Amino acid sequence: KKNIYSILNKQFGFDSFRGEQEAIIKRTVVEQKHSLVLMPTGSGKSLCYQIPALYFDNCTIVISPLIALMQDQVDVLKKKNISAAFINSTISKPEKEKRLKEFVEGKIKLLYVTPERFRKTDFVEQIKKAKIDLLAVDEAHCISEWGHDFRPDYSRIGEFRELMGNPLTIALTATATHDIQEDI
């Protein structure tokens, strides 16, 4: 039977959780509650959505602001034999279509995209067909107009969530003042 501890150990090679990871992951997989996670850089925020992504039966969308960050995360996951991919402007149209099709078919467990990807009608039409259990919003401070690197499409994540059938959502950031937290 799948459990968060065996996923932590078998997929990621760790014997125990760090800091608040365990409580956050349990809130997601056991209580099935939305979360806003504030954890310092380097404290293992990514595991807080990656473990639930592997625990749940269906797929996870990860909204991330930086193409380089996406690529790094996907590379790390692939080295651990986890089916992950990204769709962004660095790849060809046929490759984007292939990855999107595989995601909709459930062959890709985690799909990393920028919020701007939701401007693309063909992407949105396909995403509506996918079975999505979890939406992870990385660098969630970008949602807030109070944030130093505000991205307008981040403020539309509520709309994007609806298109996906309102999946369980976890938003993560290392930097969020009280105003930014309220905004998110």
PLM region descriptions:
Residues K1-P40:
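Conserved pre-motif I regulatory segment
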Residues V30, A53-Y55, L77-K79, K101-G106, ...:
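Conserved catalytic network of the ASCE P-loop NTPase/AAA+ motor domain
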Residues Q32-I51, I61-L66, T173:
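Walker A/P-loop
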Residues K128-I184:
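Post-DEXD/H (motif II) to motif III coupling segment of the RecA-like Helicase ATP-binding lobe
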